[in-house]
Amino acid sequence: MTEEADFSEQITDGKNKSNVRCQFCNCLMLKAQEGTYNQEEVDVPLMTQKQDRTADSLNSEPLKDFWLVKDMMTFENIGFSNTVDGRKFLVCADCERGPVGYHDLSTRHCYLALKRVVHKDT
């Protein structure tokens, strides 16, 4: 179970109030007002996997707060993983840390997890 976080300060008129950046290298991923707030619980692999996991299983956590980006070209800088169970996972294109969200292949929409990024303009 994930701890509840309050992201209300990051949302203005249903959009991201400030730029969205990688929490590790500060790379700009998404400019302000480009993502739409979306709540939907989805299991996303942990950023750090446990050593004792089997090769075909990923340790994951349920996340529910996302920035919805309908066109992948909207991103300033994002990377995509190989396809896993009908999804591609989003990573920082500069430092390759992640996943910071996922890309749904059926809708072609991207979901950037608020919990996995930082929100700041500089």
Curated annotation (Swiss-Prot):
Keyword Protein transport part of the UniProt annotation: yes
Changes seen on gene knockout: RNAi-mediated knockdown in follicle cells results in the apical localization of the basal membrane (BM) proteins trol and vkg. Results in the apical secretion of vkg, which associates with the apical plasma membrane with an adherent organization. No effect of the localization of proteins involved in intracellular trafficking such as aPKC, dlg and arm.
InterPro entries (UniProt xref): Mss4 (IPR007515), Mss4-like_sf (IPR011057), Mss4/transl-control_tumour (IPR011323)
Major localization class: membrane
UniProt: Zn(2+) binding residues: 22, 25, 92, 95
MSS4 domain span: 9-120
Keyword tags: Cell membrane, Guanine-nucleotide releasing factor, Membrane, Metal-binding, Protein transport, Transport, Zinc
Any one Gene Ontology molecular-function term assigned to this protein's record: zinc ion binding
A biological-process GO annotation: polarized secretion of basement membrane proteins in epithelium
Function: Guanine-nucleotide-releasing protein that acts on members of the sec4/ypt1/rab subfamily such as Rab8. During egg development, essential for establishing and maintaining epithelial cell polarity by regulating the correct polarized deposition of basal membrane (BM) proteins such as trol/Pcan and vkg/Coll IV to the basal surface of follicular epithelial (FE) cells. Likely to function by restricting the activity of the vesicle transport regulator Rab8 to the basal membrane, and thus directs BM protein-containing vesicles to the basal side of the FE cells.
Protein name: Guanine nucleotide exchange factor MSS4 homolog
Organism from which the protein derives: Drosophila melanogaster (Fruit fly)
Lineage of the organism: Eukaryota, Metazoa, Ecdysozoa, Arthropoda, Hexapoda
